[in-house]
From Swiss-Prot:
Gene Ontology CC annotations of this record: cytoplasm
Catalytic activity of the protein: a ribonucleoside 5'-phosphate + H2O = a ribonucleoside + phosphate
The protein's name in its UniProt record: 5'-nucleotidase SurE
Temperature dependence: Optimum temperature is 80 degrees Celsius. Active up to 95 degrees Celsius.
Organism expressing this protein natively: Thermotoga maritima (strain ATCC 43589 / DSM 3109 / JCM 10099 / NBRC 100826 / MSB8)
Binding site residues for Mg(2+): 8-9, 39, 95
Family: Belongs to the SurE nucleotidase family.
GO MF annotation: an example: 3'-nucleotidase activity
């Protein structure tokens, strides 16, 4: 397959290098990734300033470019410029830390894959769910095995897979729902050496979903969480209720 690999941790990150090198053992791999950390940039794109792209070296088997853009920019550039619109699969990752619950709305990793889904290209976001001790190689090897088994024709149009891999021994995988996992944010006030106040966002994770088949519970129990998601955000149940009342 011709595979595009991107991420939001930057082209220098270990996660994308390990993933690209392992995938290139069996596939034709192209890497187009941000030239610096772009975590939590969501699905932002660059439209008011130029995008710069520079060829870089990862390995002999991988064609790689860094860009000044976001993960979504990287996918657009790669598809239209680097790969001449011939892409069989897009993989975003391996991310350092989980992308579960409401995190996916902020995640550049997920948005890179979602950009591919919006083009109706098979796309996967993959994260090593342990931020402090990420197992990039374990996540990448899981993905390689998964690709040999999974039938992408089972996915609805414009749908991607969000994969979170636990650290340590993997018991198997589960197809899961996006959870209600979210953050309770607060801001720490600090003072610069020049006497100016600034703020640093902090937070505590909230995991209170009462459903059993959600992403973080699978990971907590040692299973890889695989969640099919799409860019269509309409709340269908609420829409039906509103129409019944007001139409």
């Amino acid at each position: 397959m011709r595979i595009l690999v991107t991420n939001d941790d930057g082209i220098q990150s270990k996660g994308i290098i390990v993933l690209a090198e392992l995938l290139s053992e069996e596939h034709e791999v192209f890497v187009v990734a941000p030239d610096k950390e772009r975590s939590a940039t969501g699905h932002s794109i660059t439209i008011h300033v130029p995008l710069w792209m520079k060829k870089v070296f990862i390995s002999e088997r991988v064609v790689a470019y860094s860009t000044t853009g976001t993960p979504a920019d990287c996918v657009k550039l790669a598809y239209n410029v680097v790969m001449d619109k011939r892409v069989d699969l897009i993989v975003s990752g391996v991310n350092r830390g989980p992308n579960m619950g409401m995190d996916i709305l902020h995640s550049g990793t997920v948005s890179g894959a979602m950009e591919g889904a919006m083009m109706n290209i098979p796309s996967i976001a993959i994260s090593s769910a342990n931020y402090e001790s990420p197992d990039f190689e374990g996540a990448a090897r899981f993905l390689i095995d998964f690709l040999k088994e999974f039938d992408f024709s089972l996915l609805d149009p414009f749908t991607m897979l969000n994969i979170n891999v636990p650290a340590g021994e993997i018991k198997g995988w589960r197809f899961t729902r996006q959870s209600r996992r979210r953050w309770n944010d607060y801001f720490e006030e600090r003072v610069s050496p020049f006497g100016e106040k600034y703020y640093w966002m902090m937070g505590e994770v909230i995991e209170d979903d009462d459903r059993d088949d959600v992403d973080y519970k699978a990971v907590r129990e040692g299973y890889v969480s695989i969640t099919p998601i799409h860019p269509f955000l309409t709340n269908e149940q609420c829409l039906k209720k509103l129409r019944e009342v007001y139409d």
